Amino acid sequence: MLNEKQVSEKLGNGFSCDFVEVIKINHKEVRPFDLENYSLIFTSVNGVDAFFANGFKPDENFMDKHFNKIYCVGKKTKARLRKYGFGVFKLKKNAKELSEFIVENCAKERFIHFCGNLALDILQKKLPLQNIEYRKVVVYETELLYPKVEHQYDAVAFFSPSGVRSFVQHNLLNFSKIFSIGETTTSEIYKFTDKEVFTGKDNDLAALLQLIKVEGK
């Protein structure tokens, strides 16, 4: 999770920031079931954490006939899977690119997507239309907190579409500059403003901080 020390180290003393809690993550209890013959999809760090918290045990040994391929969105999600001791067969920067890759290259596989209740429905809409077996399993819930921000800031940075929806409930996007961690989050921001949004590459935190350092002066 991003903290003030990370921001200070990356941006230097010329920047100051506050953190506003816009969402709360609650893991759901899901009884583990057999994953045999399924490929697994993770589109967030929270999905990975909730998956393993529920005791699921994927089989990544490709020598086994029914091993599980793992697909994911974002470098942070890949890193979290590594933390649990699992590699990734294919990494894409957003759900749209992952859906396109699956349609073009993996149409005969069966997929289970472990995600939150507010996950975008890109995969759910696209894969079944191509006769690709897809199942969504909600393993965590995202609660929108709808904060009211009284202080005036020069810029704002968003890290998820749900964070955007929570923030705009009681706040205007009347900032000099708006930053976003990736294209999916940027698409959500543009539903509420026509101002330019500075978008980081590949949903990568370091890339976003570098963008803020360059454009936020």
Residue ranges and their predicted role:
Residues 1-217:
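Signature of uroporphyrinogen-III synthase
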